[in-house]
């Protein structure tokens, strides 16, 4: 499990170490880890460290000190080291002295011969975009295609929200210390490496699943299981206008677990043509017993669609609401707020704005939490980084790592997957987070098939790669 910590939590954990260690020892410990990772990056890119050139772009304060100490350690390993001081009067004095003593050079700009740039401009206590001088330096670095290693966070990106409101550093690698911060999931930080500096960190409720976490939770049939005990998923989706939504949603539910899927709606003929294992009926009342309902994809907002939504929410079963269901729900939020059974809402940004009365804005975690608490429902906010908030509970962050899932019908596939996990008995937040993780893996696999490179994919192909993504966990 990945844990993401606030700046205040990190600072509180650093305090006892700073009080007990000799002055500067914690900075040098962090910088040594940073230099080690930079050395690995240099070796991977250029074949070694000796004779290579690094340049630290140094701001005021400890972040710049980390960068200077790392450059000093690399200098001792045989690299040439330069430093651009953005604020010479406020540069970390001890780190600067060590850097110059090691033979490091102070320069006005980054040389075109530089193999790697160290971003030591702004640390986790900073905020806002790059100031003009730093922005100019990194614009030149980007134009020259020199890779950047960021110290703790890429400068110019908000540490708590991942928001970028102006010029910011584009990092190939970010090396962070002690614990991950939300920005490492919410923004593009390149590859992220965590260096252990000995912090004793308190509890965090901002989490991220890893493959082992998903594998441990995904239902696997046991020797006493049958199609009913594994969970029966009910799907209320599709219409004469959008029958494909029903096909995609039910197909994903079929692929996600080994139980049973029941479908009710006007697209039952199309569903059976694609998935003969589905039990299909024309109305929800005729569907039979299920353990969870998925309602909304392609459903329409007419009287029949409203009746299906009301039917599902009136049960004491877990319910996932998506797409047209969310559009109708925006006018009747009390239908969810009054439920005792688990409810999962899966809006994109536009649907979120209708539900919450305002778009999520830069603070997607805070906005998702607020809506989940207000409605008493698990909220999954779609995006390249999926944010899942449990009411009064944890938030799960799932960075997809690519954008191949941004295709029509992809959300219908995700809804079917989550519904199947709800039917299996998984708690709503974990079901949403696990499904989002596998959905992202399936999207990447679909884009990579048949290879050798990635290519545009579709929701049907994403659904077709769910099983492969599960098998690879």
From Swiss-Prot:
Q: Where is this region: NADPHX 2?
A: 348-354
Show the segment(s) annotated as NADPHX 1.
62-66, 123-129
Q: Which of UniProt's keywords are assigned here?
A: ATP-binding, Isomerase, Lyase, Metal-binding, Multifunctional enzyme, NAD, NADP, Nucleotide-binding, Potassium
One annotated GO molecular function is: ADP-dependent NAD(P)H-hydrate dehydratase activity
Q: Which reaction does it catalyse?
A: (6S)-NADHX + ADP = AMP + phosphate + NADH + H(+); (6S)-NADPHX + ADP = AMP + phosphate + NADPH + H(+); (6R)-NADHX = (6S)-NADHX; (6R)-NADPHX = (6S)-NADPHX
User: What does the entry list as the binding residues for (6S)-NADPHX 2?
Assistant: 298, 412
- EC annotation? 4.2.1.136, 5.1.99.6
So where does ADP get bound?
382-386, 402-411
The organism's superkingdom is given as Bacteria
**Gene3D superfamilies with a match to the protein in the record:** 3.40.1190.20, YjeF N-terminal domain (3.40.50.10260)
Segments forming domain YjeF N-terminal: 10-205
The annotated region (ADP-dependent (S)-NAD(P)H-hydrate dehydratase) lies at 211-473
Q: Residues that bind (6S)-NADPHX 1, according to the entry?
A: 152
Name the InterPro entries for this protein.
Carbohydrate_kinase_pred_CS, CARKD, Nnr, Ribokinase-like, YjeF_N_dom, YjeF_N_dom_sf
Domain (YjeF C-terminal) spans: 210-473
TM region(s), chain numbering: none
UniProt-annotated stretches for the region NAD(P)H-hydrate epimerase: 1-211
**Family membership:** In the N-terminal section; belongs to the NnrE/AIBP family.
Function statement: Bifunctional enzyme that catalyzes the epimerization of the S- and R-forms of NAD(P)HX and the dehydration of the S-form of NAD(P)HX at the expense of ADP, which is converted to AMP. This allows the repair of both epimers of NAD(P)HX, a damaged form of NAD(P)H that is a result of enzymatic or heat-dependent hydration.
Please give the HAMAP family that the UniProt record associates with this protein: NADHX_dehydratase, NADHX_epimerase
What the entry lists under PANTHER family is as follows: ATP-DEPENDENT (S)-NAD(P)H-HYDRATE DEHYDRATASE (PTHR12592:SF0), ATP-DEPENDENT (S)-NAD(P)H-HYDRATE DEHYDRATASE FAMILY MEMBER (PTHR12592)
Return the protein name: Bifunctional NAD(P)H-hydrate repair enzyme Nnr
Organism field? Mycobacterium tuberculosis (strain CDC 1551 / Oshkosh)
